[in-house]
């Protein structure tokens, strides 16, 4: 029995300690000047248990200084004129425009006082009446970071416009005026949001359509090399200006180029049929001139061979004279 009594005595001692601590906290709460704050602090201290003990709640104070970079500072309580340590993690409602949690110097703040390892600390820091804190002027704003959601916004509206347009197409039996308005609104919105995607197809179409037409005109106009000179220049223009579109144009041009080459060959044959006769006559005259010049000093055989055509030429002249 004596051993059981001894074992029961040690657990009886610890409850006395919290009673003393509660007694010590009472003057602190009563000294704060808030009659309702005392019992509120005691009731909140009981559930806190392992957490930090709450000394006072909803205390107003003025920020003495706050370092945004290090993320801590001190608040001077308006009731007891004591300095309370504040960490940036204790700020409950931060300014939504600020990127970091902070408190401005000289700002009036509402907070709860909690016992920390080295003294009183602030917790649940907000503005007076639960309003978000203004924050330090040295803290970075989020204005620069708002541009990204603004850029993402138009595509969402763009999708909504498509949905509205689809719903308008389904309701074709309705009035014609709203359909006309929807049709008028579509191109404007499409042009605003994705201008680059709309410009490229319009820029591509004339490039594919124009060159073959111009090539045909050049073929019909000149039989020389003007058409051939114009084509490689255009290809170089396409290659230099838009290298990605090299594969597209040649596929469309191959059949036309083949047809153009056939036309050129036909034209070349026609020109050859017209041009070679004068060139042959000229060559014959040259050969006739060369042949009589060479044989005189060398052999008489060649002169004999050259004489019969002269005789033959005189014979038709005589025949022409007889006919006259």
Curated annotation (Swiss-Prot):
Residue numbers carrying Phosphotyrosine: 162
CDD domains in alphabetical order: CSP_CDS
Feature type site, description Cleavage: 219-220
UniProt PTM comment: Ubiquitinated by RBBP6; leading to a decrease of YBX1 transactivational ability.
Region (Interaction with ss-DNA): 15-71
BP-aspect Gene Ontology terms: CRD-mediated mRNA stabilization; embryonic morphogenesis; epidermis development; miRNA transport; mRNA processing; mRNA stabilization; negative regulation of cellular senescence; negative regulation of translation
Residue ranges of the region described as C5-methylcytosine binding: 65-70
Modified residues (Phosphoserine): 102, 165, 167, 174, 176, 314
Any one GO CC term of the record: extracellular exosome
Biased composition (Low complexity): 155-166, 194-208
Modified residues annotated as N-acetylserine in this record: 2
Sites annotated Important for C5-methylcytosine-recognition: 65
Principal localisation: cytoplasm
Domain CSD: 58-128
Composition skew (Basic and acidic residues), residue ranges: 292-305
Sites of N6-acetyllysine modification: 301, 304
Sequence position, cross-link Glycyl lysine isopeptide (Lys-Gly) (interchain with G-Cter in ubiquitin): 137
Similarity comment: Belongs to the YBX1 family.
Function: DNA- and RNA-binding protein involved in various processes, such as translational repression, RNA stabilization, mRNA splicing, DNA repair and transcription regulation. Predominantly acts as a RNA-binding protein: binds preferentially to the 5'-[CU]CUGCG-3' RNA motif and specifically recognizes mRNA transcripts modified by C5-methylcytosine (m5C). Promotes mRNA stabilization: acts by binding to m5C-containing mRNAs and recruiting the mRNA stability maintainer ELAVL1, thereby preventing mRNA decay. Component of the CRD-mediated complex that promotes MYC mRNA stability.
Assembly and binders: Homodimer in the presence of ATP. Component of the coding region determinant (CRD)-mediated complex, composed of DHX9, HNRNPU, IGF2BP1, SYNCRIP and YBX1. Identified in a IGF2BP1-dependent mRNP granule complex containing untranslated mRNAs. Component of the U11/U12 snRNPs that are part of the U12-type spliceosome. Identified in a histone pre-mRNA complex, at least composed of ERI1, LSM11, SLBP, SNRPB, SYNCRIP and YBX1. Interacts with IGF2BP1 and RBBP6. Component of cytoplasmic messenger ribonucleoprotein particles (mRNPs).
Protein name stated in the entry: Y-box-binding protein 1
Gene this protein is translated from: YBX1
């Amino acid at each position: 029995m004596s051993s059981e009594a001894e074992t029961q005595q040690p657990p009886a001692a610890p409850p006395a300690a919290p009673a003393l601590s509660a007694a010590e906290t009472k003057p602190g709460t009563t000294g704060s000047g808030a009659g309702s704050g005392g019992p509120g602090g005691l009731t909140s201290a009981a559930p806190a248990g392992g957490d930090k003990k709450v000394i006072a709640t909803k205390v107003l104070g003025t920020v003495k200084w706050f370092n945004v970079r290090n993320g801590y500072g001190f608040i001077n309580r308006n009731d007891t004129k004591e300095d309370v340590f504040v960490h940036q993690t204790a700020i409950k409602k931060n300014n939504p425009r600020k990127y970091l949690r902070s408190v401005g110097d000289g700002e009036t703040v509402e907070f709860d006082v909690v016992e920390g390892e080295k003294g009183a600390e602030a917790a649940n820091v907000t503005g007076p009446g639960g309003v978000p804190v203004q924050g330090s002027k040295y803290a970075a704003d989020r204005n620069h970071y708002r541009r990204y959601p603004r850029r993402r916004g138009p595509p969402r509206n763009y999708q909504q416009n498509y949905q509205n347009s689809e719903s308008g197409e389904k309701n074709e039996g309705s009035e014609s005026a709203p359909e006309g308005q929807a049709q008028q609104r579509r191109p404007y919105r499409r042009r605003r949001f994705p201008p680059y995607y709309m410009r490229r197809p319009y820029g591509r179409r004339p490039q594919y359509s124009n060159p073959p037409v111009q090539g045909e005109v050049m073929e019909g106009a000149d039989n020389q090399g003007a058409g051939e000179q114009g084509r490689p220049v255009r290809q170089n223009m396409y290659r230099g200006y838009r290298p990605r579109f090299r594969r597209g144009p040649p596929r469309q041009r191959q059949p036309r180029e083949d047809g153009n080459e056939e036309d050129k060959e036909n034209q070349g044959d026609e020109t050859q049929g017209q041009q070679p006769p004068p060139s042959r006559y000229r060559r014959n005259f040259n050969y006739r001139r060369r042949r009589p010049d060479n044989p005189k000093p060398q052999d008489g055989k060649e002169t004999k061979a050259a004489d019969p055509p002269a005789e033959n030429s005189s014979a038709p002249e005589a025949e022409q004279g007889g006919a006259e």
